[in-house]
Amino acid sequence: NLTAIDQSTDTCTNNFATMNPLDNYYAQATFSEGNLKVATASSPTTYVTSTIGVTPNFKCYWEAKFDTTQSGNGEIGMVDKVTTGASAGGGASRLYYQRNGISVNDLGQVWGNNSNTGQSLGSLSTSDIICFAWDGTNNALYIRKNGDAWVNSGNPASGSSKTGAFVTPDSNITIFQAMGDQAGNTNSTASINLGSPPYSISSGNQDGNGYGNFEYAVPSGYFAINTKNLAEYG
């Protein structure tokens, strides 16, 4: 009784990233849908990361959506460190607390480097898809909701000018896609599409190499997170 959603495009010669159940020391999260849907526990406040680190100079695209929206408790984004053991920084283990952590919470607010950026995607529902485009060459992240304009008038094609981007303090970093809690009083659930979606896609967009299955168009020069793309461009 498998449907198309239950089938992965992953092969023995090309592996797509998923979320990593081994990076689960603090989070005590549960993983489903091929490790692309994550539900956090109600007490810890932390995050989990993806299985493939995106190396510097790679430009990647991914999508995600919240399956629960609970007043700013959930967050989805990227970070340059895993949480296993104490590497995330003791009690300050929220995703957006990290120096190179950038996230969108389930209120649509964009956070980074332990502060609210003042930018927002507007209100989010469980049907809204958050789009991320990371320019590793220029340490710049672009974010939008659905097919809307990129937040802060962002332009993923702007290169070193980083027009409207959320910029990490450090350059030349390896980043991971991440999901977690901003508050520890409840659990959050999100689905992450790193090229092989855990939810229904109506439009079916691919990157320039023909990889991935995304709801919205992949910006030119950005690619799904898989081993072939990283070998070619990473």
Task: Please annotate each region the language model reported.
Residues 1-234:
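PRY/SPRY (B30.2) beta-sandwich protein-interaction domains
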